[in-house]
Amino acid sequence: MIIFNLSSYNPGPFILVGIPGLEQFHVWIGIPFCIIYIVAVVGNCILLYLIVVEHSLHEPMFFFLSMLAMTDLILSTAGVPKALSIFWLGAREITFPGCLTQMFFLHYNFVLDSAILMAMAFDHYVAICSPLRYTTILTPKTIIKSAMGISFRSFCIILPDVFLLTCLPFCRTRIIPHTYCEHIGVAQLACADISINFWYGFCVPIMTVISDVILIAVSYAHILCAVFGLPSQDACQKALGTCGSHVCVILMFYTPAFFSILAHRFGHNVSRTFHIMFANLYIVIPPALNPMVYGVKTKQIRDKVILLFSKGTG
C-alpha cells in the first residue's frame, strides 16, 4: 500500500523497503550481513582494547587507528542492525527524527573516516620523511587538536544536510527503496525544489573527500621519494612495509566509495538492486576487513593479538 504524507513539515514515519527486487531473499541475505557485522564489531573492539591497554601502542599512529576503529563501529552499527530488522522482522518503519539521526551518523562517519585516513597519511609522512622530528611535530597536544579538528570539520560538513531536510515539505509517498536513510534519497520524496539539497549534499562532502585524497596522494608522493632515496634495500622494504596496511585500507575505503557515488550519479544503466546491495556491503565490509589488515600487516598489533589469545588459551 502506498503511504502518503499530508502533514508537510511534520512527516510521519518513513518506510524502508530493503533491497528492491530481492525482497523474497531478505531472510537469506541477512545471514552473511549478520556474520560480517559480528566480525566487524569483534575485530574493532579487540583493536580498541589492545590500543587502550598496551602502553607500547600509545603512539600517534595507533591513536588515529583507534579513531578509525571507533568510526567503523559507528558506521556499521548505524546501518546494519536496522537492515537486519528489515530482513528478518519486517520492521520497515522509521520515524523522521530516527531517519535524520541515522543519516547523520552514516554521512558523518564516512567523512570522518576520510579525514582520519588523511591524518594517518601525514603521520606516515612525518615518520619517514622527518623521523628525527617526529616526537616534536606530533606531540600529544598536536594529536588531540588534530582529532578534534577533523571531528569538528566533519560535523560542520554534515549538519547542514540534516537542517536542509527539516526545511522540506513532504507530501508524496514516504517509501524509501533502501535499507537506510541517506540524504538525497530522503530529499527526493519532498514536494519542493531540492536543488540546494542536491548540490550541497552531493558536492560539498565529495569535494571534501577529494581534497583528502589529494593530500594523501601528495603525502605518499613525498614518502616514495624519501623511501627510494634510502641507502639500503632493507631500510626501503621496512619503510614500505610500515605503509602497506594503511595503503590497503585507503584502497578498500576510497575505491568502492567513489564507484558507488559515480554509479549513483552517472550509472543510469546500473540497476537499483545492485546499487542498494553495494551500498549495504560498503558500510559493513571495510569495517570488518580493516582490523584484519592491520592485524596481519602491523607487527606490533599482530604480536599483541597472538599474546592476547595465547593468554586466553593458556
UniProtKB/Swiss-Prot annotation:
It is found in: Membrane. Residues 54-59, 123-149, 219-242, 297-314 are cytoplasmic. It holds the Pfam family 7tm_4. The chain crosses the membrane at residues 33-53, 60-80, 102-122, 150-170, 198-218, 243-263, 276-296. GO terms for cellular component: plasma membrane. Keywords: Disulfide bond, G-protein coupled receptor, Glycoprotein, Membrane, Olfaction, Receptor, Sensory transduction, Transducer, Transmembrane, Transmembrane helix. Residues 1-32, 81-101, 171-197, 264-275 are extracellular. Glycans are attached at N5, N269. Gene3D superfamilies: Rhodopsin 7-helix transmembrane proteins. Disulfide bonds join C99-C181. Its main location: membrane. It is a multi-pass membrane protein. InterPro entries: GPCR_Rhodpsn (IPR000276), GPCR_Rhodpsn_7TM (IPR017452), Olfact_rcpt (IPR000725), OR51/52/56-like (IPR050402). GO terms for molecular function: G protein-coupled receptor activity; olfactory receptor activity. Belongs to the G-protein coupled receptor 1 family. Odorant receptor. This is Olfactory receptor 52H1. It comes from Homo sapiens. The lineage of its organism: Eukaryota, Metazoa, Chordata, Craniata, Vertebrata.
